[in-house]
Amino acid sequence: PIEGSGCPDSDGDGIYDNEDQCPDEPGDAENNGCPLVDADGDGVLDGLDDCPNEPGPAQYNGCPSPQILINEVLYDPPNDLPGDANGDGTREPQEDEFIEFYNYGGDLDISGWSVHDNAEERHIFPDGTVIPAGGVLVLFGGGTPTGTFGGSIVQVASEGILNMNNSGDFVTVYDSNNISVLTFDIEPLSNNPNESYTRNPDITGEFEQHAGIAEANGALFSPGTMVDGSNFN
């Protein structure tokens, strides 16, 4: 035909062979006549997919979402010295609050990620913050954390406070592109427990008050370790 300068449309995709980069394979005009391939079936075309053989959402360019969760949270430190969760020798309710994060995926670089309490930014993870596969990071409200904490990464809130409200709060973690990665609603757990809430069993379970779990042997919290005090890995 005249439109195709005398060239046929061999693959019948509506694009004449002289303009079709894949003349024997039906394709899309936006892709110069070549097929729009999505090898992993995640809805992100291979040409735009940073992980073409691993399904993942568009917001992460086709790569899997970060696999991180909150395993334990202390928003109501116990009274007096038993509430010294960060181990610095003093009980200060804002400083002894903590959030324990567990990474159940591969090594995860969270440099530049941020933690918000409701709308307030409370912490930005500094450059070089990488949680290893199966690793833990404990974020305290402040103070001078003293102890091994199961070999976990330990940081204090860059804004000097977490300020988790005993009557309920909403914690959100954003990645370096300001995409929400993790949300946690404290409100269902808001009963002024004077101890932490932790998953039981660790990682996979629902949240329960720490001291009531048999393996805790009465301990009120376990930042950086499993509920029985053992290391995660």
Each predicted region: which residue ranges?
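Extracellular calcium-associated, cysteine-rich motifs in secreted modular proteins
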Residues: 1-67
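Activation on beta-sandwich/Ig-like modules and their edge loops
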Residues: 65-209, 226-233
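Acidic, Ser/Thr/Gly/Pro-rich low-complexity segments and short DxT(G/T)-type signature motifs
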Residues: 59, 212-213
